[in-house]
Amino acid sequence: MIKPKIALTIAGTDPTGGAGVMADLKSFHSCGVYGMGVVTSIVAQNTLGVQHIHNLNHQWVDEQLDSVFNDTLPHAIKTGMIATADTMETIRHYLMQHESIPYVIDPVMLAKSGDSLMDNNTKQNLQHTLLPLADVVTPNLPEAEEITGLTIDSEEKIMQAGRIFINEIGSKGVIIKGGHSNDADIAKDYLFTKEGVQTFENERFKTKHTHGTGCTFSAVITAELAKGRPLFEAVHKAKKFISMSIQYTPEIGRGRGPVNHFAYLKKEGLDDELSK
């Protein structure tokens, strides 16, 4: 029997299953990767917004990570919602011990509803503790603005932001997602590495049901990196995956519903292909 590749997510929860650890694990499964999850925050949220957040003590996060790493090593790691500086330091300790494992950061700062998920002190700490360790960071435009301090209102500003991530912050790669741009028809993303810039374009679907798209996108990249895919191929797969997940959204809930984490499997009949 061939052992599956393993991906670890470290993030908050979503009881409705649209975002956070729950969305990550479903995305890992759809990519044929065995998923593990460490919880940083218990988040009471739904398609209407975030009602309550209970951030776990960093020692509880450490205990979970210790359990994982004392038993098995993941082939790739992603972090999502990390609401305290102490928890960031705890995670950094494990990442520093396993620098060869690909690491993806989804810098979750705002929920789709606009609710803030990270205080200013923690935002500043993110730049010094975790971002320099990342193989790729996946900010949307508002998150890229928060991190770089720029007002990103043009392609020129996107290019400037990408250079800040690579040359000043020290991330190996960053993909700045254009889903929040004003282009009504095309969703354009920009992948920056030391080798240069590559762009990805997809049709933009007219729907409000996009809850958890950032989590899902970064989770698919993580799963593909766990399989040993090059970063460009991982991002290309994630773009196709998220596009189909939005196109075939299940329209759950009374607000911004989740995407369909299994649409890629069912539409393309790739149950076997995705596990390769």
Swiss-Prot record:
Signal peptide bounds: none
Enzyme Commission number(s): 2.7.1.49, 2.7.4.7
Known catalytic reactions: 4-amino-5-hydroxymethyl-2-methylpyrimidine + ATP = 4-amino-2-methyl-5-(phosphooxymethyl)pyrimidine + ADP + H(+); 4-amino-2-methyl-5-(phosphooxymethyl)pyrimidine + ATP = 4-amino-2-methyl-5-(diphosphooxymethyl)pyrimidine + ADP
GO CC annotations on file: cytosol
Annotated metabolic or biological route of this protein: Cofactor biosynthesis; thiamine diphosphate biosynthesis; 4-amino-2-methyl-5-diphosphomethylpyrimidine from 5-amino-1-(5-phospho-D-ribosyl)imidazole: step 2/3; Cofactor biosynthesis; thiamine diphosphate biosynthesis; 4-amino-2-methyl-5-diphosphomethylpyrimidine from 5-amino-1-(5-phospho-D-ribosyl)imidazole: step 3/3
Binding residue positions for 4-amino-5-hydroxymethyl-2-methylpyrimidine: Q45
Record keyword Cell division present: no
GO biological process: thiamine biosynthetic process; thiamine diphosphate biosynthetic process
Matching PANTHER family: HYDROXYMETHYLPYRIMIDINE_PHOSPHOMETHYLPYRIMIDINE KINASE THI20-RELATED, PHOSPHOMETHYLPYRIMIDINE KINASE
Function: Catalyzes the phosphorylation of hydroxymethylpyrimidine phosphate (HMP-P) to HMP-PP, and of HMP to HMP-P.
Family under the similarity heading: Belongs to the ThiD family.
Name of the protein described by the UniProt record: Hydroxymethylpyrimidine/phosphomethylpyrimidine kinase
